[in-house]
Swiss-Prot record:
Keywords: DNA damage, DNA recombination, DNA repair, Metal-binding, Zinc, Zinc-finger
CDD domains in the cross-refs: TOPRIM_recR
Designated name of the protein: Recombination protein RecR
Signal peptide limits: none
Taxonomic placement: Bacteria, Pseudomonadati, Pseudomonadota, Betaproteobacteria, Neisseriales
Lineage: superkingdom: Bacteria
Pfam families xref list: RecR_C, RecR_HhH, RecR_ZnF, Toprim_4
Family affiliation: Belongs to the RecR family.
Gene Ontology annotations of biological process type: DNA recombination; DNA repair
Annotated source species: Neisseria gonorrhoeae (strain ATCC 700825 / FA 1090)
InterPro entries: DNA_Rcmb_RecR, Rcmb_RecR, Rcmb_RecR_Znf, TOPRIM_dom, TOPRIM_RecR
Positions of the Toprim domain: 82-177
One Gene Ontology MF term: zinc ion binding
Amino acid sequence: MNSKKQDAFQRLIGALKVLPNVGPKSAQRMAYHLLQQKRKEAEELVDALQTALRQVCHCARCNTFCEGGLCDICADETRDGRRLMVVHMPADVSNIEAANCHDGLYFVLMGQINTALGMDVSAIALDRLAQRLDGGEIEEIIIATAFTAEGNATAYVLSEFFKNLPYKVSRLSQGIPLGGELEYVDAGTLAQAVYERRLIKEGGA
């Protein structure tokens, strides 16, 4: 490759490396595959990504991704507004919904605390969570973070945040494997963890 083509190829590899669990070798293989065999699909991927960047935003209530002001769950008036489940990422909402074990509402942190990567309290949208709690009918908050070092650190910060607020606070039971991310937990185990959630504090300030 000449220098310009090499720069373009290396830029593509660099862009692919931002994806989760994609290292330099995987990114290089993906780049070769897209350019050599899947050019039409690559163009469709670029178009889909550009469309998503233009149209997808954060739900005004729960902070997940949606198109428009509210996501489908927040707009559903049949949901139980008394229970708010706090999760790490939108994938956790999808997994919990698939397990059919929570008919309340959600708040998506869009991050978790990871001191090794310099991700502190600012990574978990506490300001937006505080806004979500204003003027609502919420009675119980369910902390649904993973049982990893990052998830436990996030759960601790959340429990401290809720300590002096008038809500019953609970956390998923440890039926979820230690070190397990909710995204990869089967529906039965996840449902059991929700139903057997552990009380952190009773309602009342």
